[in-house]
Amino acid sequence: GLKIGYVPQRLVADHTVPIRVRRFLTLRKKAGKAKLATVAEETAIEDILDKPLHVLSGGELQRVLLARALLDDPDLLVLDEPAQNLDVTGQLAFYKLIEQIYAERDVSILMVSHDLHLVMSSTREVVCLYHHICCSGEPHMVTRDPEFISLFGNDMARLMAVYSHSHDHDHDHDHDHDHTHDHAQHHGGTSGHHHDHSQEDEAAR
C-alpha cells in the first residue's frame, strides 16, 4: 500500500520527559542503525542525535520530525505548515532541504501552506481551498482563475503570476510536487501544495 510520512506544524517537547533525539526517531520504528545514520545525514541532524528533544531549536526540531517521517521511505510526504514557526533564515534552510529531498528521492510531496509566494514559485500543482475546492491546476493557471482573483484581488493575482512564470522556467522536477494553499487562516501557499481557506481569508504561501 501507499506509505505516507507526515511532518506536523509543530511538536511541543515536554522537558519533564527527557527523551533524546535518537530514541524519539526510533519509537515504534523498525529502522536499523545504518538506516538511521543515512537519514540523519540526509536531514543534517547527525550532531544532535544525543541531545534531549526539549533543548532543540525550532529548525532542529523540524529537521528531526522530517527525519522521522523519512525513516519509512514514504511514497507520499505530507508537510503541514512545516516552517510556520521558524524565522526567515530557518524557513529558507528548511525548504531548501525539502527541495533536495524531492530531487533525490522517489517521493511525492503534499504541503499545506499559507505562503502564496512559496506555493507559486516552487510547486507543480496548486489546490486552493476555502470551504471547498475553489480552483486547482498549475500555478500559472490558478493565478488566472476568476475565483482566485475574487479571493485575492487583481493586484495579488498579478504578483503571484510573476512567481508562477518564474517557476515555469526554473522547475524541472520529474515527479509530483503538490501544494495545497489553505485559506482557513491568514493567507499563504504550498509544494504539490494544497491551499485551504478554513478561517478568516486574508490576502497574503
Predicted regions and their residues:
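H-loop/switch region of ABC-family ATPase nucleotide-binding domains
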Residues: 113-114
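Conserved catalytic motifs of ABC-family nucleotide-binding domains
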Residues: 73
